[in-house]
Swiss-Prot record:
It is found in: Cytoplasm. This is 16S rRNA aminocarboxypropyltransferase. It comes from Methanosarcina barkeri (strain Fusaro / DSM 804). Pfam families: Fer4_RLI (PF04068), Ribo_biogen_C (PF04034). One of its GO terms (cellular component) is cytoplasm. Aminocarboxypropyltransferase that catalyzes the aminocarboxypropyl transfer on pseudouridine corresponding to position 914 in M.jannaschii 16S rRNA. It constitutes the last step in biosynthesis of the hypermodified N1-methyl-N3-(3-amino-3-carboxypropyl) pseudouridine (m1acp3-Psi). The keyword ATP-binding does not apply. Its EC number is 2.5.1.157. S-adenosyl-L-methionine binds at residues 25, 72, 96, 115.
């Protein structure tokens, strides 16, 4: 993966091999050289932030995200089984705040984001809107995610820390 400019945040995917390869957003991002794909947990970069829907601390600009962001590309039915394995790695686990999925599989469902949406949300919140748009541009439904979540994403991007993210989130549900 080559960031297109020096300020792009490195994106990493742990691919659990549970999805349809033709519909896999993680694989597609790797094909376009927007993210690096890993099939072994042991090879993930230890200094990156793992987006984890099972934790309470929200991702915010206060986090040290320069070393990259990791998403777990797996079936939502397997999340409860796979994340405990990742907990052993001593990564910085952060959750994304309340957002609606814009993809055709989980459209309009809160928190049920796919890998591309998770990356885009994190990038947007961290002030890397152009990189977020670049990630979503590879999917014909990508604009739907941004349209559905425009207002909360803009507000989350103004937060300084996790506490403020959670406070803003409380306005949306």
């Amino acid at each position: 993966m080559n960031p297109t400019n020096q300020r792009d945040i490195p994106l990493y995917i742990y691919h659990a091999g549970q999805c349809d390869p033709k519909k896999c957003t993680g694989r597609k991002l790797a094909r376009f050289d927007l993210a690096r794909l890993y099939d072994r947990i042991s090879r993930l970069p230890r200094s990156a932030i793992l987006l984890d829907p099972t934790v309470e601390k929200a991702l915010s600009p206060a986090d040290d995200y320069k070393k990259g962001i990791i998403v777990l590309d797996c079936s939502w039915e397997e999340v409860e089984r796979v994340f405990p394995d990742l907990a052993k790695l001593n990564l910085k686990h952060r959750a994304l705040p309340y957002l609606l999925a814009g993809n055709p599989v989980n459209f309009g469902r809160p928190f049920k984001l796919n890998s591309a949406e998770a990356f885009a949300a994190a990038l947007y919140i961290l002030g890397h809107k152009e990189q977020a748009e670049k990630v979503l541009s590879k999917f014909n439904w990508g604009h739907s995610f941004l349209e559905l979540n425009k207002e909360p994403l803009e507000e989350y991007a103004t937060a300084k820390n996790s506490t403020e993210i959670v406070e803003i989130q409380s306005h949306y549900f």
